[in-house]
């Protein structure tokens, strides 16, 4: 799978969208805190950001494969997943900072 700089920028934008939801995630957790056994709210929110980003980036990269008529193999799927994880990993410190500030 060929990933362009434009694709990486799109993945970064998807990550920004996921992190923009941090206040909403805190609201969800706080509204149900009495019935959930959450020991670390910040880690829970981090997981919610991760799940949102992985879902959206996976859809973007799957659509890219379809739009470009590329073969969809397990290798190309894993390569796409690795690229998505790479973009996320580059921003972990910033994501955690945003969570701490919320």
Which residues does each predicted region cover?
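Short terminal alpha-helical segments
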Residues: 1-33
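Non-transmembrane, amphipathic alpha-helical segments
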Residues: 3-6, 10, 37-46, 73, ...
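Acidic-enriched, low-complexity/disordered segments with a strong bias for Aspartate over Glutamate
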Residues: 5-7, 33, 56, 67, ...
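Generic detector of leucine side chains in alpha-helical contexts
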Residues: 11-15, 61, 78
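Amphipathic alpha-helical interaction modules
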Residues: 20-65
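Amphipathic alpha-helical binding modules
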Residues: 70-102
